[in-house]
Amino acid sequence: MTRTKVAIIGSGNIGTDLMIKVLRTSKHLEMGAMVGIDPASDGLARAGRFGVPTTAEGVEGLVALPGFDDIEIVFDATSAGAHVVNAARLLPLGKRLIDLTPAALGPFTIPAVNLEDHLEAPNLNMVTCGGQATIPIVAAISRVVPVEYAEIVASIASRSAGPGTRANIDEFTETTSSAIVEVGGATRGKAIIILNPAEPPLIMRDTVFALVTAADPDVHEQIRASVDKMVADVAAYVPGYRLKQAVQVTEIPADQPVHTLLAPDAERPTHQVSVFLEVEGAAHYLPAYAGNLDIMTSAALQVAERIAAGKADR
């Protein structure tokens, strides 16, 4: 079987973890290039030891590589600003882009929710690590009952956040909030990220709060079942993804001012759904606490595998 050649731009934590996943676990992909801007980066050094072609000259260095024409898919693991430049250079050359930054030039893509809708898109955006972990849960609740407001809190180990992640903090909240609405189906959404400085580093933890109208106990059970199914769907490509405890559906007290979170014309919801998750990494590059890397790179790999498999089927 002929494998699809891919390149990764960004030799930091995310790009390096993704490279190792492609090399060790991919069924349909082959590393064609690892691209960075720091000649001394660990990611480029590792790529060189693995025999992967490398360049420290950024996107122009990629285009200049002898094997560039054979590369079909390019993962961008840089920053939101850099992705704008990279996309402008690569899309006219016919490369498919999988964007692991919050730039969101292409459609938001969550494999367990809407991958099949975007397989032909030239540039797919992977939202954010927090989005990959929590938006499937919002979507699962939305499949049962309308979600007037959804709020997610992503807590990641500070040590797992490299310079690219830190540079994108504002874009993280904006992009994730938008995707909660666009992909998750909530009327309104908010995202909060916490870089936890605790030592030893703690595993990625995510919390989803959703405000719904669901007075019927049978609906509560439908919500729990939908969330359980979605967790299993995500865990199929992120094995360390799991519920921390049972889904909670609680009545909203009459004196709680939830109207401040809702659209002006929204009816007051009756219940809050609370979902608590944790994501343990596969430790391909960083230790297992870096589940935020693992869910992002695993989701991106799932997208590329599906694109490559679809090409092979045609």
Swiss-Prot record:
<feature type="binding site">
    <location>
        <begin position="11"/>
        <end position="14"/>
    </location>
    <ligand>
        <name>NAD(+)</name>
    </ligand>
</feature>
<dbReference type="InterPro" id="IPR003361">
    <property type="entry name" value="Acetaldehyde_dehydrogenase"/>
</dbReference>
<dbReference type="Pfam" id="PF01118">
    <property type="entry name" value="Semialdhyde_dh"/>
</dbReference>
<comment type="similarity">
    <text>Belongs to the acetaldehyde dehydrogenase family.</text>
</comment>
<keyword id="KW-0058">Aromatic hydrocarbons catabolism</keyword>
<feature type="binding site">
    <location>
        <position position="292"/>
    </location>
    <ligand>
        <name>NAD(+)</name>
    </ligand>
</feature>
<dbReference type="InterPro" id="IPR015426">
    <property type="entry name" value="Acetylaldehyde_DH_C"/>
</dbReference>
<keyword id="KW-0560">Oxidoreductase</keyword>
<feature type="binding site">
    <location>
        <begin position="160"/>
        <end position="168"/>
    </location>
    <ligand>
        <name>NAD(+)</name>
    </ligand>
</feature>
<dbReference type="GO" id="GO:0051287">
    <property type="term" value="F:NAD binding"/>
</dbReference>
<dbReference type="InterPro" id="IPR000534">
    <property type="entry name" value="Semialdehyde_DH_NAD-bd"/>
</dbReference>
<protein>
    <recommendedName>
        <fullName>Acetaldehyde dehydrogenase 1</fullName>
        <ecNumber>1.2.1.10</ecNumber>
    </recommendedName>
</protein>
<dbReference type="GO" id="GO:0009056">
    <property type="term" value="P:catabolic process"/>
</dbReference>
<dbReference type="GO" id="GO:0008774">
    <property type="term" value="F:acetaldehyde dehydrogenase (acetylating) activity"/>
</dbReference>
<keyword id="KW-0520">NAD</keyword>
<dbReference type="Pfam" id="PF09290">
    <property type="entry name" value="AcetDehyd-dimer"/>
</dbReference>
<dbReference type="InterPro" id="IPR036291">
    <property type="entry name" value="NAD(P)-bd_dom_sf"/>
</dbReference>
<feature type="active site" description="Acyl-thioester intermediate">
    <location>
        <position position="129"/>
    </location>
</feature>
